[in-house]
Amino acid sequence: MPTILLVEDNELNRDMLSRRLERKGYTVLMAVNGQQGVDMALASPPALILMDMSLPIMDGWEATRRIKADERTRHIPIIALTAHAMDGDEQKAREAGCDDYDVKPIELPRLLEKMERLLKA
């Protein structure tokens, strides 16, 4: 199964989602802030990135822009994850370079469907 990079600063959310994805057969790498997410994506490009948008040090918007700006990582699909479903956030995510968007709390079947669609593309 593919390797997923989960960029999430909330320990509970990170642990819960990573365990659920691992049970589905994915290998999950974890970063706790946007800068670490960018560094990990560049060092060992994953098949897909799940990016929280509200992160310390560097937010998910900027981390996504940097990953998509680099020729080594621009092909990696990124799904934006946000707890604050504000009007315009989905558009903002797409403008930053995200390939899809999901809101918290995460519904695993919905997220898996989005992941599988992007991984097949």
Regions found by a protein language model. Give the residues of each.
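Charged docking surfaces used in two-component/phosphorelay signaling
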Residues: 15-23
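C-terminal output helix
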Residues: 106-115
